Design a protein with these regions (language model features):
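Acidic/histidine-enriched, beta-strand-rich ligand/metal-binding domains
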Residues: 1-80
């Protein structure tokens, strides 16, 4: 998996990801909210994700595996 593109808009970092399950992420450095858009079109917002953890997620060899292990069941989330 790899980051296809990255856009920074104010406090938001938007990444399009080449992954089987994850299509796109949006991270707000101010609110620490992470929005993940999956390949099936569903979007979820995760609260209070530390910036350092988001950076590790972006740089990981397998974002899908990192997400499943360190984010998906660790942080409060809602479907949006």
């Amino acid at each position: 998996m790899a980051i296809i593109s990255e856009i920074i808009q104010g406090t938001k970092i938007i990444n399009e990801i080449q992954s089987t399950n994850i299509k796109k992420t949006e991270y707000d450095t101010e609110t620490k909210k992470l929005v993940v858009e999956f390949s099936n079109g569903f979007k979820y917002e995760y609260d209070n994700v530390p910036h350092q953890l988001y950076t590790q997620f972006r740089m990981s060899e397998s974002q899908g595996k990192f997400f499943s292990t360190n984010i998906s069941k660790t942080f409060k989330y809602k479907k949006i």
